[in-house]
Amino acid sequence: NPQQDFMRF
């Protein structure tokens, strides 16, 4: 999910 990947840190 690229839209949620920004929160995968």
Curated annotation (Swiss-Prot):
Keywords on this record? Amidation, Neuropeptide, Secreted
An annotated GO cellular component: extracellular region
Compartment list? Secreted
Top-level taxonomic group:
Eukaryota
Could you tell me which residues carry Phenylalanine amide?
Answer: 9
- Coarse class of the primary localization is secreted
Tissue-specificity statement? Detected in the thoracic perisympathetic organs in larvae, and the dorsal ganglionic sheath in adults (at protein level).
Some GO term, biological process aspect, for this entry: which one?
A: neuropeptide signaling pathway
State the family it belongs to.
Belongs to the FARP (FMRFamide related peptide) family.
How is this protein named in the record?
FMRFamide-15
> Which species?
Lucilia cuprina (Green bottle fly)
